[in-house]
Amino acid sequence: MADKPDKKPTNHDPSANESRSREPGPEGRSGPSPESTGVTGGGEEASAPHVRTEEVETLVHKPFNPAEATGALHRRVDGNFLDYASYVIRDRAIPALADGLKPVQRRIMWSLHEKDDGRFIKVANIVGYCMQYHPHGDASIGDALVVLVNKRYLIEGQGNFGNAFTGDAAAAPRYIECRLTELARTELFNDEITELVPSYDGRNKEPVVLPCRLPLLLMLGTEGIAVGLSSRILPHNFPELIQAQIAILKDKPFKVLPDFITGGLMDARDYKDGQGSVRVRAKIKIKDESTVVIKEIPPGCSSESLIASIEDATRKGKLKVKSLN
């Protein structure tokens, strides 16, 4: 009787899997060995003889020091940032000390000077004409022109230019007109000594600064934010500034303090030659036992915002008011 052939091993037979996986290894060994798998009898790791190990340097994080950065990208970023910062300071936000005007204000005054014939001209016309010097849109030109009109020194307005006391906005540029004041005509312009440079597109010429004989920086005041710095100079009284100029020429002492178009009571004890700050409060008159009249308000505050704050305090029970007119 013939013997039955042996049963063919299946994948479920561990010995069959072991026999299949055995291949000649390095140095004539067949199959995986404890050394090649990195496991020893004691459970400790061991490197295979045919694997080369190298020591890798560990990188330690250090705080970034800009002074030590010298790469090409860093130099490019530094250069571009400085160019942008210088542009914003010179050409947008900060006034020049020589004439006290920001670039947009100077370009508005120069446009009015070139178009001046003594008559009123539409604000929309001046805004469009000024855009050949100022490439930052008509809105910024129109807003700056309205501010100059409300200062009442350099530009005379005709129409609704808003109200600093009530906070009302100006009418549309096509409905209002303006022209230079006589003070601006005589004290700001002198074509013979005005240095001109090409405009932003090279098609026109505009002044570097105006040969102003007035301390406009103190007359108008300014507030601007640039890259890395800001400027805020409070406005001053025009006759007091002229008296101060005369005192300087005569080598006499003088005292100049800020002055605001809306009035108010000012505490200037901390104000010293532009350093420190002033505190301005509303000026109140007691008419009778039950009536208080607010005669003057601080700068930056309008009658509408003041009424709203009084009504809010009344609703919260902080203030008792019978009527508000």
What annotation goes with each model-predicted range?
Residues 2-277:
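Catalytic phosphate-handling regions of large nucleic-acid enzymes and associated NTPases
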